[in-house]
């Protein structure tokens, strides 16, 4: 369960290392984000040689959460960290590589580019 002020690690090579959630997108009173939800984030730490500087505001999609997600077949999936992938204005990933596994739920939410770049889809 990702909410405002949650810190997420970044699972791509956009240059940011850690981000802070400013807002959960998707409705007036939406409080929590899960896998596949879009959030507005600000960069808290970044690689010095990248164009993503500290304080940059961007959109991101949540790709891993510690909170388990129930699937239609009754099984659950959870990850060891909370992670996001940064998006550009066209909702495409800013980076060209994705690190670590991502959930299959991203395919249902039409983030096919992230699914195709990921090394493993669970």
Swiss-Prot record:
Q: Which CDD domains match?
A: Ribosomal_uL14
* Disulfide linkage: none
Q: Name one Pfam family in it.
A: Ribosomal_L14
Biological process (GO), any one: translation
Tell me the keywords, alphabetical order: Ribonucleoprotein, Ribosomal protein, RNA-binding, rRNA-binding
List the GO molecular function terms: large ribosomal subunit rRNA binding; structural constituent of ribosome
On the tree of life, the source organism's domain of life is Bacteria
Q: Which residues form a coiled coil?
A: none
Give the GO cellular component terms, alphabetically. Answer: cytosolic large ribosomal subunit
Species the sequence originates in:
Cytophaga hutchinsonii (strain ATCC 33406 / DSM 1761 / CIP 103989 / NBRC 15051 / NCIMB 9469 / D465)
Complex and partners:
Part of the 50S ribosomal subunit. Forms a cluster with proteins L3 and L19. In the 70S ribosome, L14 and L19 interact and together make contacts with the 16S rRNA in bridges B5 and B8.
Q: From the Swiss-Prot or TrEMBL record, give the protein name.
A: Large ribosomal subunit protein uL14
């Amino acid at each position: 369960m990702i909410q405002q002020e949650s810190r997420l690690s970044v699972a791509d090579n956009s240059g940011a290392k850690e981000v802070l959630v400013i807002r959960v997108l998707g409705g007036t009173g939406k409080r929590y984000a899960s896998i596949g939800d879009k959030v507005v984030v600000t960069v808290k730490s970044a690689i010095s040689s990248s164009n993503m500087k500290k304080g940059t505001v961007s959109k991101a999609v949540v790709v891993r959460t510690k909170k388990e997600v129930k699937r239609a077949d009754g099984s659950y999936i959870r990850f060891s960290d909370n992670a996001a992938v940064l998006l550009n204005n066209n909702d495409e990933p800013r980076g060209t590589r994705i690190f670590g596994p991502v959930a299959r739920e991203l395919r249902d939410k039409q983030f096919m580019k992230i699914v195709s770049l990921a090394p493993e889809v669970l």
